[in-house]
Amino acid sequence: MDNELLLLSSNDIPFLEAQVNIHQPTLSEISLIGEESFFSGCQFLNFSKSILNLEDKTDLEDRSDFEIFMSIMCSSEKLDYKNNAMMVLTLLFPTSQIKFMPNELVLMNKNGLSRINSANFDAFKDIIVSMFELNDLDTGGGYNPADSRAAKIAEKLKKAKNRKAQDSPHKVAILSRYVSILAVGEQKDINDFMHYTVFQLKDEFKRYQMKQSFDMYVQAKMAGAKDLDEVDNWMDDIHP
């Protein structure tokens, strides 16, 4: 989505295609489910066949991303992944009851019913990708769909996840690390960051990194250093 000011405002995001607002959870709210569960759930909600190789795409060419997603969510073999996605959905729609139907996800609240289905699933993913900047994220993931064809894809993704886990066995601690760095670097109360959204935190962290690099570059130039690589102006746009 192309509305940086709305994302920075921490206001709810209108999901017009489903006639419902998507809540931007704060770090304090996310902490209730933990970063690992949060990012695992986000990856499920952002499922796309585009991550698959040509052979796998061909095998599932008659299935939409939403259909594969629903087969994953309806699987009872790996409840942890389904639960992670459900917890994220609860953060996104805190005033709604969430129910999975055969061909749609139904949100029930005081304003009536809203539906996420094959017609608006891409729009939904576009919003959460922007909210959480998921294109910058690589924490591994797992899929275990009920459908036999999708299950083949799940096995390959599971193997890829296991390889990543062996290369980087540490637990996911992206947001907490950002908070810790900014609290020290900017000399702020660490509790202040708990009211930030993910987009606000990442925006400030990127800007802080750019300013640190820019200030070091200027200081080095003033001290007479030569042959330095140019750095971006810290006030440049950071959201492509």
Regions found by a protein language model. Name each.
Residues 78-157:
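Long amphipathic alpha-helical segments with strong coiled-coil/leucine-zipper propensity
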Residues 221-240:
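Long, intrinsically disordered, low-complexity Ser/Thr/Pro-rich regulatory/activation regions
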Residues 1-67, 126-217:
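An amphipathic, hydrophobic-aromatic interaction surface with interspersed Lys/Arg
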Residues 70, 76, 214, 218-221:
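Aromatic-enriched hydrophobic runs in primary sequence
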Residues 62-85:
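Extended, charge-biased low-complexity segments
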Residues 25, 79, 116-119, 173, ...:
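Short coil/turn linker and secondary-structure boundary residues
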